[in-house]
């Protein structure tokens, strides 16, 4: 520990896209540089997350902002932090039955906004694609929002295709046949990507299949994708205000540390639909 400055940790699954970078910058904005040191860690998997939490405990880190991995059981480290009333704020994902502070986006509403937007454009058969498994907290909430909105609009659940555990590291040719089947046989006309990186992959995949966005297929995403061949304002997306989410999480943690007040605080950030050029009405 460095004398004179309080050391905190920020642990995210990865810090590799605009969403996570913006979130980290929001967290850092809450802590004056002259009085805090923030250690940034990438956890990548549950096992490494647990080791990082243990390292923070062993070295006397004063507080943690954690974007938690999705695990079937709470780790010993998380339970220890909870019992010790340790300054801890979860971000972007809360863990049911774990009574700790969190700042998350309203993923169910975000899913509903996606479905509502595409249905208003005339899309009746839609595919939701995620690189994570459908039972993870965030993905499950987004799917619930999509399906509930579909039910409210009398769209049969069979018209919504859920494609989870999508591997963005596969060569495009790996998915071309399966994707063409969805479009030609199942008549999918619009895709919702659960992650900005998945959206970018799908856009490039469609290009290899001579499918144009949005002329041939509509594509939208959670969070703002970045694709070299397109301007930053091209993609219709759900904005989760990740910078503000990070700033709010940092502010809560800073208050806990400086006041020694373990009071649990919950914040849910409202999503915004940003309509751009990657979605358009069905042309009959």
Q: Can you describe what each PLM-predicted range is?
A:
Residues 1-116, 180-186, 197:
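Alpha-helical recognition/docking segments in bacterial nutrient-uptake
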Residues 18-33, 110-113, 137-156, 201-205, ...:
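Short, solvent-exposed amphipathic alpha-helices that sit
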Residues 31-43, 147-172:
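Short beta-strand elements in bilobed, periplasmic/extracellular small-molecule ligand-binding domains
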Residues 103-128, 171-180, 199, 240-259:
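Hydrophobic alpha-helical segments within soluble ligand-binding/sensing domains
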Residues 114-153, 265-281:
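An alpha-beta-alpha
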Residues 124-125, 157-160, 213-218:
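Short acidic capping loops at alpha-helix termini that bridge into adjacent secondary structure
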Residues 180-284:
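Flexible loop/turn connectors
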């Amino acid at each position: 520990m460095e004398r004179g400055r309080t050391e905190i940790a920020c642990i995210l699954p990865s810090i590799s896209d605009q969403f996570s970078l913006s979130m980290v910058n929001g967290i850092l904005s809450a802590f004056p540089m002259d009085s805090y040191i923030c250690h940034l860690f990438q956890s990548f998997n549950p096992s490494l997350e647990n080791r990082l939490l243990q390292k923070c405990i062993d070295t006397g880190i004063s507080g943690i902002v954690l974007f938690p991995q999705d695990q079937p059981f709470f780790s010993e480290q998380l339970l220890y932090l909870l019992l010790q009333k340790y300054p801890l704020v979860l971000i972007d994902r809360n863990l049911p039955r774990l009574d700790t502070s969190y700042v998350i986006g309203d993923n169910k509403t975000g899913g509903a906004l996606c479905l509502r937007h595409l249905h208003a454009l005339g899309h009746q058969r839609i595919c939701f694609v995620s690189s994570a498994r459908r039972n993870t907290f965030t993905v499950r909430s987004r799917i619930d929002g999509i399906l509930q909105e579909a039910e409210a609009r009398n769209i049969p659940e069979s018209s919504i295709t859920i494609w989870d555990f999508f591997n963005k590291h596969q060569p495009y040719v790996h998915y071309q046949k399966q994707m063409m089947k969805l479009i030609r046989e199942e008549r999918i006309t619009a895709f919702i990507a659960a992650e900005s990186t998945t959206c970018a992959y799908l856009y490039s995949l469609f290009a290899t299949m001579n499918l144009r966005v949005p002329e041939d297929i509509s594509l939208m995403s959670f969070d703002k994708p970045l694709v070299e061949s397109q301007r930053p304002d091209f993609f219709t997306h759900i904005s989760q205000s990740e910078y503000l989410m990070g700033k709010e999480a940092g502010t809560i943690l800073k208050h806990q540390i400086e006041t020694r007040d373990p009071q649990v605080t919950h914040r849910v950030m409202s999503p915004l639909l940003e309509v751009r050029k990657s979605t358009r009405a069905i042309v009959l």
